Regions:
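A glycine-centered loop/beta-turn motif at secondary-structure junctions
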Residues: 167-203
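Structural motif
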Residues: 50-54, 86, 182-184
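Beta-strand-turn-beta hairpins that frame and shape the catalytic cleft
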Residues: 1, 134-138, 175-181
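Pocket-forming structural segment of enzyme catalytic cores
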Residues: 102-173
Length: 236
């Protein structure tokens, strides 16, 4: 079973690559394919069990958009074929419509969903996060210079319980299209949320979903959830 990690040399802020290290630590038979910006993506001719991409700098967003724009048709095919994608942090914006910079410059993105990200590089948004995925509680963080906006009703990945969603005016966080899942929430997401990680492992075909250090991970997850839900804790 193969997982493709897109551009780990640049999409590695906030420890996001630990998501993949944790999967590999938990499931020894996984093969991790790291695709660099100069490589032909593995997904171009194959169907990985999971495609992952994490957070990057604003400059590198433009490099990644330029690279992936060549493969929009293939990415659309994979989404339609229910291949699993997990996209975290500001990588969410890559697959949206556009990014508007402070100088009004517009960066066109891949346009798989109708979101406009608005940058404010003088004000970083930091927040604790609690949300809901089906019947699973989600905990994590947000740390970003952007919020995303849309005039359309999207299918959110998470329903926010505490913090905000894609922007301060909505509780809808992220997006889910078939098995394509993208969210601003970081953590690393899979380490902080073992129930979600076990769900994802089962989804991609892993039979024994026992995680590395599962007992400790669950203890930390439950402690963090209870702590984040206390009203005395300020979110942002």
């Amino acid at each position: 079973m193969k997982i493709e990690v897109l551009f780990p040399e640049v999409c590695n802020l906030y420890g996001d690559l630990a998501n993949i290290r944790y999967l590999k630590k938990s499931f020894k038979d996984l093969e991790i394919i790291e695709t660099k910006l100069t490589d032909e993506p593995y997904f171009l001719k194959h169907k990985p069990a999971l495609i992952y991409m994490g957070t990057m700098t604003e400059h590198n967003q433009e490099l990644v958009i330029e690279k992936l724009s060549k493969y929009k048709k293939r990415i659309k095919e994979l989404i339609d074929q229910n291949v699993h994608f997990l996209i975290t942090g500001n990588a969410f914006e890559i697959f949206g419509k556009e990014i508007i910079c402070e100088d009004k410059r517009v960066i066109k993105c891949l346009d798989f969903y109708d979101t406009t990200a608005k940058r404010d590089m003088m004000h970083r948004f930091n927040s604790l996060y609690v949300g809901k995925f089906e019947d699973i509680n989600i905990v994590g963080f947000k740390s970003q210079f952007t919020h995303s906006y849309t005039k359309k009703k999207l299918n959110p990945l998470f329903e926010t319980v505490r913090s905000c969603g894609l922007n301060p005016d909505t509780m809808d966080e992220g997006i889910r299209i078939n098995n394509f899942m993208a969210t601003y929430v970081i953590g690393p997401l899979l380490i902080l949320n073992p129930p979600f990680t076990k769900w994802l492992a089962k989804e991609i075909g892993i039979k024994d979903t026992t995680l590395a250090f599962e007992e400790a991970a669950l203890d930390s997850y439950n402690y963090r959830y209870n702590e984040y839900m206390q009203k005395k804790n300020i979110y942002y």
